[in-house]
Amino acid sequence: MASSKARVQRKAQANAPSHVKRKMLSAHLSVELREEYGVRSARVCKGDTVAIIRGEEDVRGTEAKVLDVFTKTGRVSVEGVTINQADGTAIAHPVHASNLIITKFNTEDQWRMDSLSRKKEAKE
């Protein structure tokens, strides 16, 4: 992004193509995962276990599984993080991916795990 103006940055993020927005869904790894895989961050995927490090006091520190990932908005739905509607029903409250730390990967995606191990081998 070429501009330094905040509103131009926001517009570029909002109008970015999906392959660029996908990269904006990355979160830092926990210290243990960082040492194991040799990378600092990775994309958040459904089934990962994450810890919320920023946000409201009642959700901060929560560690739970990712239920859904919204590429368009750059937010993640985390198990147990809900808000109440006016009629009393609880709905999922999406959290921005930058406010999360990945503590455990969903190991069902073999391509993703191979990709992480290749990155580790490349650093060695």
Question: What is each model feature region?
Answer:
Residues 1-46, 119-124:
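Intrinsically disordered, Lys/Arg-rich N-terminal extensions and targeting peptides
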Residues 40-43, 57, 94:
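Residue-level "contact hotspot" at macromolecular interaction interfaces
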Residues 53-60, 82-84:
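Short, charged beta-turn/beta-strand-edge "cap" motif at the junction between a beta-strand
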Residues 63-119:
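Structured, basic alpha/beta domains of bacterial-type, RNA-associated proteins
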